[in-house]
């Protein structure tokens, strides 16, 4: 059988040889463009085992396949030996997409082998090369011959990686509070730099304030859950850290939510008390605040404790071991599957759903993000401006700096472009994540981009990064924006683009880490399955659009208060995102949009998001992250099927020539005329959700009402 490991070092090669029946049962295949490392090549030259070297470019696909069949017919396993290409840290595989695609549509079955290399410490818990603490080799079930065999092999690797990570020493019996205390005391002089008042708080003092806050929480509430209504800043970090230390479930509230959404979240989570800040309640007056008696003003409470108590706890931390300090502070020891926090979905299609996040999920999320970043503890600085009610805000803005030993710079407003640019330049920030609207504000304030030159990673989170914004950042400022794809159910992201690795050795093959239109490769520990639009079964052609399903240690398995039997989005260990996308042979994920944002026209699926971009071009209008000008929805047709409708703020009234403009604009772009909306409806504004995404349900109901279509 054809055996396809994701990566191989000499130790793995020898173990594989044993597992497959010894050297008389194995033939090794080496492809010249991605040859194995020096140790393997020396071993092959010394032992002269059965096998062959080839070059697809020079000898052609047919020749290579004939050599594979020759050894298979002789009763041997043919094992592909991947090389050591340049790519992102902790990548899934060392096999380039073109080499995997070699076996597509052939009569060859394949057995994927996933080789996992792990360390017992946080900074490099997942690695791809020596040295490592432990090696796991998983022989996956054979993949049947046929179309897109290479992409199906990738899917098997991802599932095997998830199974291995579940047994990682850090995740099998995690104690997140203990790890946080140990990490902070290991880097006590790291600082939280507050961008509002330019104050600095050492992590040792931050831990002391969090320990004091655990007592405040216990005094005010005996409930298992507590709400946190705070923006990014030192009080938000202290409150979330205190909840983890106290074993209390933190529910970070979206303070841009509507009153109806806020009431729904409070009832769903069963909240009675909320941690906040006096200044923030005065600033955020439009928010539907709870009664004052239900609010815990953390700034006032800590002020009443006195600075002497803070200094006492800080002094205690200097002379006690982490275990002694935890015992003295009565730090909780929660189980790995105890709920640490609750996030809520954005409510794009329905009311926000509560997502319980366990301690194991949080730690797995931080590990997967840390392993993908080439940052140095003790000198690199992270910018924290994404609110903690978003998974990226909690994981990347709070836990990653604390566990990784990085300074963090906080600021409460993600769209304060001028101030954020100044903070990035002042503190030489290396990592920043922001929403597309916040990024646009930063680029506008940056002028020539030099103030952002220290950024090694500039991630776009929260909503889709427009091609126009990404290209403008690259062309005008020389800044690569890294698109990510996330959901509230998968922490911190499902996938993220990464910068290309430095290439001092130009002869080494470089695997893609980002591509226009893609959201990058799935993070370590996230398995992606592409299915049909109406079935949870894996697609035989994952490189064609289908529903995106996920599983992994940082992916939820349930919703708050909803059994899995009542949720069509949960199927075994898999979670359905409701998004449509596909995987490329080189492991990059493309997300096309929500399932509801596609219209079925015969055999064709028309993506609304892509159609909206085309309509903006037809009307020569620039997209605005803060105010939508148009939206496309799908409504039932009176003759059966579906019809496309364009809601437009660009029209006060619609005349027949408007339909011709759209129709000719679509066909001039070599698209079918069926892409032209059947109806154009003038509206005063396009409804959006607090997270900035389209309020599709309101748009749909409004379109049906205007067209007098009755809904069940």
Locate the predicted segments by residue.
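Conserved pre-ATP/AMP-binding loop-to-beta segment of ANL
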Residues: 188, 231, 296, 304, ...
């Amino acid at each position: 059988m054809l055996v396809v490991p994701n990566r191989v070092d000499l130790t793995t090669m020898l173990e594989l040889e044993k597992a497959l029946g010894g050297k008389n049962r194995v033939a090794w295949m080496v492809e010249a463009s991605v040859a194995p490392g020096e140790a393997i090549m020396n071993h092959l030259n010394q032992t002269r085992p059965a096998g062959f070297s080839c070059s697809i470019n020079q000898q052609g696909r047919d020749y290579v396949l004939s050599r594979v069949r020759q050894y298979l017919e002789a009763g041997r396993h043919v094992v592909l030996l991947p090389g050591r290409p340049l790519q992102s840290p902790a990548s899934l595989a060392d096999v380039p997409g073109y080499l995997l695609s070699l076996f597509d549509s052939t009569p060859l079955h394949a057995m994927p082998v996933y080789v996992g290399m792990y360390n017992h410490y946080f900074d490099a818990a997942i690695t791809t090369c020596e040295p490592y603490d432990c090696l796991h080799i998983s022989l996956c079930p054979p993949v049947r011959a046929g179309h897109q065999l290479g992409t199906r092999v990738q899917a098997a690797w991802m599932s095997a990686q998830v199974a291995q990570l579940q047994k990682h020493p850090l995740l099998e019996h995690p104690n997140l509070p203990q790890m946080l205390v140990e990490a902070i005391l290991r880097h006590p002089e790291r600082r939280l730099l507050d961008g509002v008042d330019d104050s600095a708080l050492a992590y040792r003092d931050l831990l002391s304030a969090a320990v004091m806050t655990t007592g405040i929480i216990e005094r005010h509430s005996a409930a298992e859950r507590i709400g946190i209504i705070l923006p990014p800043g030192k009080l938000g970090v202290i409150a979330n850290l205190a909840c983890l230390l106290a074993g209390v479930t933190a529910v970070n509230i979206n303070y841009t939510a509507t009153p109806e959404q806020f009431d729904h979240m409070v009832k769903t989570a069963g909240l009675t008390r909320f941690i906040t800040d006096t200044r923030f309640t005065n600033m955020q007056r439009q928010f539907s605040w709870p009664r004052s008696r239900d609010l815990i003003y953390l700034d006032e409470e800590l002020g009443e404790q006195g600075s002497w108590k803070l200094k006492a706890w800080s002094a205690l931390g200097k002379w006690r071991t982490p275990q002694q300090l935890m015992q003295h502070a009565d730090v909780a020891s929660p189980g790995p599957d105890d709920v640490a926090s609750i996030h809520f979905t954005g409510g794009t299609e329905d009311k926000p759903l509560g997502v319980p996040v366990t301690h194991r999920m949080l730690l797995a999320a931080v590990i997967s993000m840390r392993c993908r970043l080439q940052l140095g503890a003790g000198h690199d600085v992270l910018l924290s401006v994404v609110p903690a009610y978003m998974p990226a805000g909690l994981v990347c803005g709070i836990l990653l700096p604390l566990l990784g030993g990085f300074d963090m710079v906080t600021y409460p407003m993600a769209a304060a472009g001028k101030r954020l640019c100044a903070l990035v330049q002042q503190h030489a920030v290396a990592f920043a994540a922001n929403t597309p609207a916040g990024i646009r504000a930063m680029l506008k304030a940056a002028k020539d981009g030099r103030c952002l030159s220290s950024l090694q990673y500039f991630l776009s989170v929260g909503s889709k990064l427009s091609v126009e914004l990404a290209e403008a950042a690259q062309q005008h400022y020389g800044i690569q924006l890294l698109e990510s794809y996330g959901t509230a159910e998968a922490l911190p992201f499902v996938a993220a683009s990464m910068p290309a690795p430095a290439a001092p050795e130009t002869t080494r093959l470089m695997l893609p880490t980002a591509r226009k239109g893609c959201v990058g490769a799935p993070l370590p520990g996230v398995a992606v399955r592409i299915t049909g639009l109406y079935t949870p079964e894996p697609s035989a052609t994952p490189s064609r659009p289908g529903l995106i399903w996920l599983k992994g240690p940082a992916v939820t398995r349930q919703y708050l208060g909803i059994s899995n039997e009542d949720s069509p989005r949960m199927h075994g260990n898999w979670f359905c995102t409701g998004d449509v996308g596909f995987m490329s042979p080189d492991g990059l994920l493309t997300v096309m949009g929500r399932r509801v944002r596609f219209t079925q026209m015969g055999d064709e699926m028309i993506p609304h998001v892509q159609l909206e971009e085309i309509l903006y071009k037809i009307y020569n209008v620039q997209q605005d992250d803060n105010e939508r000008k148009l939206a496309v929805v799908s409504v039932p047709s009176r003759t059966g099927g579906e019809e496309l409708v364009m809601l437009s703020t660009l029209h006060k009234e619609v005349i027949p020539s408007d339909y011709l403009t759209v129709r000719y604009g679509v066909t001039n772009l070599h698209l079918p005329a069926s892409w032209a909306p059947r109806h154009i409806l003038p509206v005063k504004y396009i409804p959006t959700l607090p997270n900035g995404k389209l309020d599709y349900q309101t748009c749909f109901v409004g379109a049906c009402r205007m067209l007098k279509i009755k809904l069940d």
